[in-house]
Amino acid sequence: MPPCSSKSILSTKSSMFILVSFALLRFIFYFVEFYRLVIGMNNLEIKRMNQKIVRNSERWEDPFDRIISFHYIDNFKKLFIL
């Protein structure tokens, strides 16, 4: 029997397919988390800041001053820790 039989090649290909599919799913999950944390939370924070501006019109704050805060940077770092 040759050292590389067709059965072992087939099992290697199927295991590689499983590994690649899990890696692709993980990439999609991280992309969705990145979008939700950075983009979605920024939109939510802008809405909150706009509500605060409407309520406290005498104390106006620029909503774009706080878009990127350390909270979002920490969450972005946590996404890429495997």
UniProtKB/Swiss-Prot annotation:
Domain of life: Eukaryota
Cellular compartments per GO CC: chloroplast
Keywords: Chloroplast, Plastid
Subcellular location, record wording: Plastid, Chloroplast
Keyword flag Chloroplast: yes
Coarse class of the protein's main subcellular location: plastid
Name under which the protein is recorded: Uncharacterized 9.9 kDa protein
Native species: Vicia faba
